[in-house]
Swiss-Prot record:
This is 3-hydroxyacyl-[acyl-carrier-protein] dehydratase FabZ. HAMAP family: FabZ. It catalyses: a (3R)-hydroxyacyl-[ACP] = a (2E)-enoyl-[ACP] + H2O. Its main location: cytoplasm. It is found in: Cytoplasm. Its EC number is 4.2.1.59. Involved in unsaturated fatty acids biosynthesis. Catalyzes the dehydration of short chain beta-hydroxyacyl-ACPs and long chain saturated and unsaturated beta-hydroxyacyl-ACPs. InterPro entries: FabA_FabZ, FabZ, HotDog_dom_sf. One of its GO terms (biological process) is lipid A biosynthetic process. SUPFAM superfamilies: Thioesterase/thiol ester dehydrase-isomerase. Belongs to the thioester dehydratase family. FabZ subfamily. It is an enzyme of class 4 (lyase). It comes from Roseobacter denitrificans (strain ATCC 33942 / OCh 114) (Erythrobacter sp. (strain OCh 114)). The gene is fabZ.
Length: 152
């Protein structure tokens, strides 16, 4: 049922997540430890549409977009471990809690997203995750969220 895959490149991510540009917000997952934890990477570029309006002349990645990138990292972790590539899998937010934003994330930053499973197991639909997003070792955001995994 589970695999020993410990990372995911963009090709594998696209085989797991239904998201596409401009809403695919994780570029690679460099560490996957089963359904326990993962480290995702988002290369932040000026080409992303949200920077047109957030904010003109001073682009800052919206906090909700950081949270979404973290959720996508968690979904990739679960999808890789449960071998969901090329299968029907959708993930829906149920709750977002304890969201805190500590520093700006701007074009040129590399956002590192460390996610941990707080509750959930293979076969279960409701999962809870905690995560920290950082840039150059400095915390940018932290959050806990609950998601429903609809695996078709």
């Amino acid at each position: 049922m589970s695999t020993s895959q410990t990372s995911a490149d963009i090709q594998l991510i696209q085989r797991i997540l239904p998201h596409r540009y401009p809403f695919l917000l994780v570029d690679k997952v460099v560490e996957i430890d089963g359904t326990t934890s993962a480290l995702g990477i988002k290369n932040v570029t000026m080409n992303e549409p949200h920077f047109q309006g957030h904010f003109p002349g001073m682009p800052i990645m919206p906090g909700v977009t950081i949270v979404e990138a973290m959720a996508q990292t968690a979904a990739v972790m679960v999808g890789v471990t449960l071998e969901m590539a090329d299968k029907e899998m959708k993930v829906y937010f149920m709750a977002i809690d304890k969201a805190k934003f500590r520093r700006k994330v701007i074009p040129g930053d590399v956002l590192e997203m460390r996610l941990n499973t707080l509750r959930g197991k293979p076969g279960g639909k409701v999962w809870r995750f905690g995560g920290v997003a950082s840039v150059e070792g400095e915390m940018a955001a932290e959050v806990e969220f609950t998601a429903m995994m609809d695996m078709g």
